[in-house]
Amino acid sequence: MMHADTALGRWMTFGVAILVAACGGGGGSSSDGVTAGIDRGGIVTATGSITGFGSVHVNGVHYVTTGATITLDDNPGTESDLRVGQVVRIEGRIEQDGVNGTATRVIFDDEVEGPVQSIDLGNLRLVVLGRTVQVSTQTSFGDRISPRSLEGLAVGDRIEVSGRVATTGVVEATRIERKNAQSSVEVKGTIA
């Protein structure tokens, strides 16, 4: 014989499960570092590499940036300050089509900035302020690096690296730019 409390509990559990399934999700992240907010057609926060302009293209979505606040390393900026390969956080809206949106904020902050300590051309790696940086064929290099590859850098060069941090702690570079010798140094990480 089933007690009323048990039956009510099962119905409540079933009801909650149906409601959760009906919501359809929309949040979460994927392996490429994409972080999404609410659902398509709603307010979103997305993080990813810039893949193009004509506004800003991130994670397959074309965000119109007219009127958006753009911030680079905590300083005001403009769309012309942004570069392909930089990992940015975008706050705004995505249209129902899932490929168009409007950004209200575009925020860039590098992963590490400082002098190159070592370069391993064979493994496409370098070390900046103790952080290992992995380069790939997808990494974009700035105009001041010639050739536009790891070979265009030397120990002692000051660089800015944008990318994603792997679970191993290695920075997977999406963009590397040479900076002036007097530029600031910056490193992010977990305090042990």
Report each predicted region and the residues it spans.
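Short, flexible, surface-exposed loop segments at domain boundaries
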Residues: 3-5, 11, 15, 20-67, ...
